[in-house]
Amino acid sequence: MAKRDFYEVLGLSKTADEKEIKRAYKRLAMKYHPDRNQGDKDSESKFKEIKEAYEVLSDPQKRAAYDQYGHAAFEQGGFGGQGGGGFGGADFSDIFGDVFGDIFGGGRRQQRAARGSDLQYNMDLTLEEAVRGITKEIRIPTLETCDKCHGSGAKEGTSAETCSTCHGAGQVHLRQGFFTVQQPCPTCHGRGKVIKEPCSKCHGDGRVERYKTLSVKIPAGVDTGDRIRLSGEGEAGEQGAPAGDLYVQVHVRQHHIFERDGNNLYCEVPINFAVAALGGEIEVPTLDGRVKLKIPAETQTGKMFRMKGKGVKSVRSHGVGDLMCRVVVETPVKLNEKQKQLMEQLGESFGGKGGEKNTPRSKSFLDGVKKFFDDLTK
């Protein structure tokens, strides 16, 4: 048979104070006491029910547990009940943590109002912005401290009061078999204080939703994957607790000329046939402007030239990377008649006596092909 609600047994509401509980118990105990109702089994049963209800509701800790868990708080040995050493439906992690805390003199401290959440903002940068550094304004949605209650969560002119259940401790003690354990107070949720008259603007939270604008200084040399932390610029904490942090996640967009690898920059520089063969001087782009690059004679496609200190300044040290220029020899197109004649003359000169000296890689390749086919026919 299911047990009746203890408040119902004593004819009380759940907001009844200690005096009302004691008064109700005395009145009902006198009415159903076995000495006044000898032989009446029904009165005896009711008296036991009244006594059990009073033992729980007159004890602040037991009452708090009953308000949170109901009769389950006292089943299987909870609060020293006879029989096994069960935990009455309470959370195992809380129980074991608090048992060992009590044994070794620790125990849980009063929970503080929750710190504000951290926020993340994804910021896209051009390569130039990332290399040189920049200050950017961002606008983010967040929770800020309520300006009406100044973060307290309480109505103007009032303040949070000490919790009457745990008397400000934030914890209630429960007896589990041979052990006394602690659990967060069900009334104040471990904070030790309750807000009876909440602020009309934030409804007791101490925070309100709004957008805020921030200036973020991006240091020179950042790269994709870098993260910048702005301490205290996250969401405001509950009821005056510390704010979280804001993390700006950097992403550098792809550049149409340069590729970045660490602190070095890479680019491809096309050169014409004549410059590659005879050598010369060309202009190449850098992030600081145009610079001259000397191309030696007989330069082949793929040749890499290093320009010291023309890369990216390291964000973590004083070092500066290099600019690596890979030349690509470009085949001439849209030749006029005179140019075609000159190219034909040049080609004939390559095919004549001693022409293999002008194109050693071609000769080496053709010799290799000839040997390959000769080996196949053997």
Curated annotation (Swiss-Prot):
One of its GO terms (cellular component) is cytoplasm. Zn(2+) 2 binds at residues 163, 166, 185, 188. A zinc finger (CR-type) spans 133-211. One of its GO terms (biological process) is DNA replication. GO terms for molecular function: ATP binding; heat shock protein binding; unfolded protein binding; zinc ion binding. Transmembrane segments: none annotated. CXXCXGXG motif repeats lie at residues 146-153, 163-170, 185-192, 199-206. Zn(2+) 1 binds at residues 146, 149, 199, 202. Residues 5-70 form the J domain. The J domain is necessary and sufficient to stimulate DnaK ATPase activity. Zinc center 1 plays an important role in the autonomous, DnaK-independent chaperone activity of DnaJ. Zinc center 2 is essential for interaction with DnaK and for DnaJ activity. NCBIfam families: DnaJ_bact (TIGR02349), PRK10767.1 (NF008035). Belongs to the DnaJ family. Homodimer. This is Chaperone protein DnaJ. The gene is dnaJ.
